[in-house]
């Protein structure tokens, strides 16, 4: 099943699987997959190109993967529409289309996929790695209704929840091309903040208070003993 999925995705991306290795161990109770991708690119985006004043955008809505995992753990009662929403989330976890499109634009200075630790963790990682900071705005964060409901009912912060499927992109200057490229793909593209010249990532909350953001464990670790 794992390799069937890998082969299907490789064909979709027009890439070749050239080798592999499998083994069994009593120490490992679940399948673990790791991979290495090798290829050529015309332009390399580096975190060191990030500069104060760059604006931060995210694609799609946040915590897509986290919502799917959380639903699998807590088994909430879902309407048929919510079940279809989960299926749509699950099929939207790749960022290949938007990352390829954005990487071609001179206005995009850096990108970082939003995985463990959510969007706050991703912003902290990319900024701290180059000695910069950021202002992030809670009111601008794109969180789907189902995600918000499941997170609220289970004491989870969606901004710190694994968000595979979202790409964090820094845009310098005119954002017209970037917005047009994402619109052409049918991908939401939301501005959530800007890079600053200090070393603090600040979340400006909807109630007017602020919070200094650090790289912390993902919210799913709250359920580490329940995910079987």
Spans of features found by a protein language model:
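Glycine-rich anion-binding loops of enzyme active sites
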Residues: 1-73, 194
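Aromatic/hydrophobic pocket-lining residues that form π-stacking "cages" and hydrophobic walls in ligand
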Residues: 2, 6, 123, 147, ...
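Solvent-exposed alpha-helices and their adjacent loops that cap or buttress functional pockets
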Residues: 10, 25-30, 47-51, 76-79, ...
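Active-site glycine-rich loop that binds ribose-phosphate moieties when present
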Residues: 34-45, 81-103
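Short, compositionally biased
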Residues: 68-85
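Active-site-proximal betaalpha loop/short-helix elements
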Residues: 87-163
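Helix N-cap motif at beta-to-alpha junctions
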Residues: 170-177
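Acidic, Ser/Thr/Pro-rich beta/coil linker or hinge segments at domain junctions
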Residues: 183-228
